[in-house]
Structure formats: structure tokens, C-alpha cells
Design a protein with these regions (language model features):
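Alpha-helical scaffold segments in soluble metabolic enzymes
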Residues: 47, 86, 90, 282, ...
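Mid-domain catalytic core of redox enzymes
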Residues: 107-212, 221-222, 304
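Conserved flavin/dinucleotide-binding core of flavoenzymes
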Residues: 189-305
Length: 305
């Protein structure tokens, strides 16, 4: 554990260019250059990378994989308190009233205007498409649409929490469908039903036919507790959850299509939440530069996986 911690600490201090590997290579054999024994790489780092990248086969380009692992080494893991909707709600709350419109169907867009189904045409000085890859390509024909990786997330409730605390539990042996799991109620109690523990688990790739039974059997082995009394609260399968980053992949794809037209999202960076946020910052900086707006943020921002 000490060697692993030291290796991750060194990685966290590594600047981006040396940390990034050749774009044409994959990370199928796991991260290299950390000086760790094979059992640590196979039992911990490979499952961790698979979790960070939603890529159980680790066909992701080495550069993208190294960037994702470095973000983890720098900031660890985090989730927004109150659920994934909390972050955009906080961003919207900082803007003037009536700035944000939701539930609007955009039918066409260009540098000077946005056409909507409900509100007609809206004028603009510049346009930023902050959407998934498919929606961006529909509005901007010519943008490349990548392949996608499917992900299934299951939420179980239990009378008592398994004794793992706030830890992320990885399947180092790849002995079942679950790639990683955590007792989410220990991390963020607001997500759990009152009086119950909430366990959130992720299946990468095609899920098994008998999903709940297979997952609960695997969770019993991972947590070392009986799961017969656990209740499946919800299961969400997304066949296009994460853009694939198979080699060669450029994790710093341009966000400026041309002056006045910008696009951001996990498909322009690493296919992670951190990558989506980073591409958004790159796009915002490009817009401020092109509009000659002073006062752009120049300090470092928190990073995590």
C-alpha cells in the first residue's frame, strides 16, 4: 500500500506532457512506468483504470488513460452532494434570473442564432454546444461521432450498510458482472431512503440477462455479507454512456470550431466527468479570448476523478 501511495503521489506531481503516453498505444496491459509489482498493477490499478474509463478491456489510448489516472492521483474520487443534478443547479443559481431556459428543443444553430421549437429564433454573439457527441453532430454536421461504451448502474437498499465505509470496492479478480461498487449512503446520506443504506454498483459492457440476481450474488462476495434481503431500487442502462477513447485518441480535441462557434463535452477531452468539465473550461476561455473579455480565471481549479 505504501508503494502504491508513493507511486500515485509521484504521478500527481508529474506535468501533463511527460504523463501523457503515445496516442497510438492502448493501456491493455495496465499503467506502466510506476515501478509497481505485477500483482498490484493487475489487482488494483487495472480495475481502477477500468472503473475510471468505463473500459474493462483497457483499449483506451495510453495518453487518455494516463491523464485520467493522474487526475485521480491528484484529487481522488468525489461525487456532488445531493446527486448529479446539484452541479448544474449550483452553476445556474450563480447567474442572473431568467438567464437559463430548460426544456427547450433546439432544431438548428449557427454563430449568430439558435432556432428552437418552442421559442422561435434567438440571436447570439457566439454559440457553445455543451452536449453529448450525438446531439452535437446533429446540430453541427461534420463533427465526428465516436463509438460508445455501455454502462449499467444499479441502486440497492439494505437494512444495514456493509462494513466498508466510504471506500470504492473494486473487483480485482473480475469474478462477476460488477466492476465497482460503494455504499453511497456512507458518502452522501442525502441520497438514501430514510432508515436504509444505499449501495450503488456499476456494470461495464453488456449486462447479464438475470441482472439483479447476478449482481446481488457478486455483491455478496465483494462485501462479505448476505444480500438476499437487499431491494433493487433502480437500474439504469445506457448503451451510449461513455465515448470510447481507443487509440489513437486525442484527449485535447479542439473546442473552437471557428471564431464564434464552440463545442465541449467528454467527447472533446477524456471521457470522464473531469474531462467534460475541463473541456468546458477550455471552451469558456476560448470564448472570453475571442470576445476580448478581460478577467478570465487563471488559477488552478480542483481536480478529481
Amino acid at each position: 500500500r505504501a508503494r502504491l501511495g508513493a507511486a500515485l503521489h509521484r504521478l500527481a506531481l508529474t506535468p501533463e506532457a511527460p504523463a501523457a503516453g503515445p496516442a497510438g498505444a492502448s493501456r491493455r496491459r495496465g499503467p506502466g512506468g510506476l515501478g509497481l509489482p505485477g500483482r498490484t498493477v493487475d489487482g488494483i490499478l487495472r480495475p481502477l483504470l477500468a472503473a475510471l474509463l468505463s473500459d474493462p478491456a483497457l483499449t483506451t489510448s495510453s495518453r487518455s488513460a494516463d491523464l485520467a489516472l493522474r487526475d485521480y492521483a491528484r484529487g481522488g474520487l468525489c461525487v456532488p452532494t445531493g446527486g448529479s443534478a446539484a452541479l448544474p443547479e449550483l452553476l445556474a443559481a450563480a447567474l442572473p434570473p431568467d438567464t437559463v431556459r430548460t426544456g427547450v428543443h433546439v432544431t438548428a444553430a449557427d454563430i449568430t442564432s439558435v432556432r428552437t421549437k418552442e421559442h422561435g429564433e434567438l440571436g447570439c454573439r457566439s454559440l457553445l454546444l455543451a452536449t453529448g457527441a450525438g446531439a452535437a453532430a446533429e446540430l453541427l454536421p461534420g463533427l465526428r461521432v465516436p463509438a460508445f461504451r455501455p454502462v449499467t448502474v444499479l441502486h440497492h437498499t439494505a437494512p444495514a450498510a456493509p462494513p466498508t465505509g466510504r471506500s470504492l470496492v473494486l473487483d480485482g479478480d473480475r469474478s462477476g458482472p460488477v466492476a465497482y461498487t460503494s455504499v453511497m449512503s456512507e458518502v452522501d446520506p442525502s441520497r438514501a431512503p430514510e432508515g436504509r443504506a444505499l449501495i450503488t454498483s456499476t456494470v461495464l459492457g453488456t449486462p447479464p440477462p438475470d441482472l439483479d440476481r447476478s449482481v446481488r450474488a457478486h455483491l455478496a462476495a465483494l462485501y462479505g455479507v448476505a444480500t438476499d434481503g437487499w431491494e433493487l431500487l433502480a437500474a439504469h442502462h445506457d448503451p451510449e454512456a461513455v465515448p470510447a477513447m481507443e487509440a489513437p485518441h486525442d484527449p485535447r480535441r479542439p473546442v473552437r470550431v471557428l471564431a464564434g462557434l464552440y463545442v465541449c463535452g467528454d467527447h472533446r477531452d477524456t471521457s470522464t466527468v473531469q474531462g467534460a468539465l475541463h473541456s468546458g473550461r477550455r471552451a469558456a476561455e476560448a470564448i472570453l479570448t475571442d470576445l476580448a473579455v478581460p478577467g478570465a480565471h487563471e488559477g488552478s481549479l480542483p481536480r478529481a476523478a
